[in-house]
Structures are given as structure tokens and as C-alpha cells.
């Protein structure tokens, strides 16, 4: 069989005017070709027929899209709540252990003035302690961290759909969540618990 004359183009043996609209191009989920998932790797404003994370999350109406956006917003707020709960749990562990993490010991050190004269200054030295949580507490800390990380990972995957509306609500959700639950991280002194660390 001589294949030298055969072209490898898409029109090979097909009439370009042939109508395929009667064919079901769905993936077995009962979807017809008019409601296929639209996924774009460029910035887009797709609302109806957008799909997120799986074919089951197929947006079929504007109301469904609005519900998804509201859910994404609250997922981002939830991430900040989980972070706050983790910090509060760490503070509770340190406090329960009887360790004062915000006060260090006072120490006298030499201080030299402009004229070279030596004088004494009292400074607060950072606390020197190492608190190691018990295994049950560490397992609970791990679950708190893992749930926060998992939710943040799903938000990152949602952002990779480059839907401008989704991105705006991700930014708004994280901002509102931080405004509501991030006030404990602003302090004058260094607080181990506020930094999310207990050791």
C-alpha cells in the first residue's frame, strides 16, 4: 500500500462542512456539547460552563457561580480562622507548661558612650527555653496545620483557573480573614505564641 500521497492533515477523508451537532460529546455525565466545561489558562471571566477541580463542579448557571464564589470567599476566611486557632492552641500549650514566653531575664551589660566612658545598661535578654509538646499535642498541632495547608492548597488550585472573579474573591477572602483573625500577631514584644511557634 502506497502511503506517500496521503496527507496527515485534520481534513483527511472528512468533509469540512459536516455537522457534528447531533452527536453527544459529553463524558458520560449526561452533558451535551452545549454545556461542556470551559477551561482557560489565560485570564478570563467565564461564569456559566466553567469547571473547577473536577467535572462534578461544573457551573451551569449564574446562581451556581455566585454560590461557588461565596463558598471560595468563606474558604479563604476559614484558612485565617484555622491559622488563628493554631496560634491560640500554641499559646495555650506554652501557658499550660508554665513558661513565660514574653519576659526574659534582666542582665547588666557594659555600654560605651560617645566619650568612651563605660557605664552600665540593663537590657532584657530573650527567654532561653525550649518547650517540646507531648505527642498527642503535637499530633493535634499537625492536624490543625494540615487542615490549614490543605485548604490553602485547594485555594491555590482554584486560583490556577485564572478566572478574574475567582481571583478577586480569593484576595478579598484572605484579606477579610486576616482582618478578622490576624489582630493577635501585632504586638510590641516578641511573643512565641503569636508567631505560631511554641518551641
UniProtKB/Swiss-Prot annotation:
It comes from the Eukaryota. Keywords: Membrane, Transmembrane, Transmembrane helix. It is found in: Membrane. Pfam families: Ctr. One of its GO terms (molecular function) is copper ion transmembrane transporter activity. InterPro entries: Cop_transporter. One of its GO terms (cellular component) is membrane. Induction: Expression is highly induced by the CUF1 copper regulatory factor in response to copper deprivation and repressed in presence of physiologically low concentrations of copper. Expressed at high levels after phagocytosis by macrophage-like cells and during infection of mouse brains, but only at low levels in lungs, consistent with limited copper availability during neurologic infection. Disruption phenotype: Exhibits a significant reduction in survival in macrophages after activation with gamma interferon. The keyword Membrane applies. Belongs to the copper transporter (Ctr) (TC 1.A.56) family. SLC31A subfamily. Required for high affinity copper (probably reduced Cu I) transport into the cell. Plays a role in fungal pathogenesis during host infection. This is Copper transport protein CTR4. It comes from Cryptococcus neoformans var. grubii serotype A (strain H99 / ATCC 208821 / CBS 10515 / FGSC 9487) (Filobasidiella neoformans var. grubii).
